[in-house]
Amino acid sequence: MGNVVYKLTSKEIQSLMAQTTFETTKLPQGMKARTRYQNTVINIYSSGKVMFQGKNAEQVASQLLPDKQSTTGKHTSSNTTSIQYNHFHCIGSDEAGSGDYFGPLTVCAAYVSQSHIKILKELGVDDSKKLNDTKIVDLAEQLITFIPHSLLTLDNVKYNERQSLGWSQVKMKAVLHNEAIKNVIQKIEQDQLDYIVIDQFAKREVYQHYALSALPFPDKTKFETKGESKSLAIATASIISRYAFVKHMDHISKKLHMEIPKGASNKVDLIAAKVIQKYDIQQLDTISKKHFKNRDKAIHLINQKYNK
């Protein structure tokens, strides 16, 4: 039986618990929650550590915690040396919306040549994780005018259809990343491509298993954790994918005449309950990811209100 251990923040634990049902009562001292998911036991401890136990522990951990590396040292980047990607012509890919109950899953692949590096730094792309949504929108609307890219959006209806067919979020992301990358390759001179660098959400073998099609250039393809800090191509893709997610969320808010929050917090539960009350559960399902625990929590809030 394999064991994989992670150290998570409170926000990361909240996001993990939103993805499946956990037991939170009658637990041993020091344990916060536990569940069994795909024949893997998941224990969440008060210390912030999370343990996955089972034959497929690593694979399940990669699905539910795609952006984390384990403290057991088993989840490492596929790259053994540090590559200075900004000295090369690269396609980078990243996604947005995977941890948000409301809104779609958006994926972008973007091509950044060496000639783009100076202007991207001047625009502030290298600080992409520090940008608020307003700045993301302003910056992305400039980037899409001169950066070869492919932006794919999996709306909630299609997302929920695939999830009901047994697709994990990792599979959805692998398929979308691979398609976006292939789309960009068609837009550039292939001899002007040194690397394809993917913001790592799963190990290479897991990605290849789920992608449905082969990696376009396996020898040039790298997977990097915290990739936006290592590659301006990933940072650019991150901004454009986030831009698409933000614009879609704005559209949902206007359509429903209420502010729809990002994330998967308790505030999200309250707004989901309001959507059900104002419209119905079917409307909620068209703008959200059904398998997140927020849906059940919203229904519980409504039941509590009417059973008082």
Curated annotation (Swiss-Prot):
PROSITE patterns: RNASE_H_2 (PS51975). It comes from the Bacteria. It catalyses: Endonucleolytic cleavage to 5'-phosphomonoester. Disulfide bonds: none annotated. Its EC number is 3.1.26.4. It comes from Staphylococcus epidermidis (strain ATCC 35984 / DSM 28319 / BCRC 17069 / CCUG 31568 / BM 3577 / RP62A). This is Ribonuclease HIII. It is found in: Cytoplasm. Endonuclease that specifically degrades the RNA of RNA-DNA hybrids. Residues 88-304 form the RNase H type-2 domain.
